[in-house]
């Protein structure tokens, strides 16, 4: 099976500009890039598709370029949004880019020029605006740009000129890397198709040469919602933002209808094994979820952390003695207490188990909160410093455990 056939079998290919892409990636002749807007100081589970694709392509001899959006992050990509993204400072972007590289190195081999990490800001921030308008802007039709899918949702609410430039700037990135780094291919999410076509067309018009683009399938659940968030919050690759246990549990709790799709698209398990697993039903789906969670946690946090997370999850949910050592936890200080105690509602908010006192109150009233195995009887319950020094295990719903200490 060729690389392209495997990508298709895993359901990763959405669209390609030309069939020449197939020969290029199969023969390890592609120098390709994927862009990352560094709007936070950590990658998320939503970046998994891009990271694993880069790894697959590199393993076949192709050269990845991880392009950090140091310039375009200052604008904000309007694709798939109805609001304007927050713009970041140069200092924010530099910090976020450094965090990204550390996480990407778990997927991509940057040694011996096998891969590159570039920052758009290195060329984009030094552009002369008049020259850009003359040399690049002249190659774009405003009529065609306004028909692009990435601008549709923003037109009714108002599309700023700042955001309107995003397609031109992303196209220029491809054009620049084609000239200076031999980058002949771009990969991205299916929502980036219009922007990617802009880059291939700019290269054709300015240089008379061919460049290629392929979009990858967005990772969505059976309801069509993007995966990578839990309770509205991102699932981070940074263990300080999302612990290895929480990361493991996110994938362990995917829906029955989604587990095999995730295994096929995100893991490196052989397709023959995945095809056999696709016949599993009922309780064996839980086994498949454990495999998914272990594989992805191991990829991000290492095998040791994956094994700890798996053992903790089995202890918590399998009826064995509770493993509190690897449980998500929050350590309070004396300053968090009032007159030597803290109420359950405040405690839940500080532990990230509820977004507000109101939400915490509803959970308690509905009987969905336990402390050390005992149901919280009323929202007025509080915990003393002595109790907290021993550690209090809060259970929210059926699957969320959190240890709070002082």
Could you tell me what each predicted segment is?
Residues 50-57, 177, 195-203, 296, ...:
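Buried hydrophobic packing segments
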Residues 10, 89-90, 96-215, 221:
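Divalent-metal (Mg2+/Mn2+/Ca2+)-assisted nucleotide/phosphate chemistry catalytic cores
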Residues 203-406:
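Conserved nucleotide- and phosphate/pyrophosphate-binding catalytic cores
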Residues 21-78, 186-193:
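N-terminal catalytic cores of NTP/NDP-binding nucleotidyl/phosphoryl-transfer enzymes
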Residues 1-32:
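Positively charged, low-complexity intrinsically disordered leader regions
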Residues 78-94:
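A charged helix-plus-loop insertion that forms the helical arch/lid used to bind
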Residues 76-80, 127-133, 225-231:
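Short acidic, glycine/serine/threonine-rich loops at helix termini
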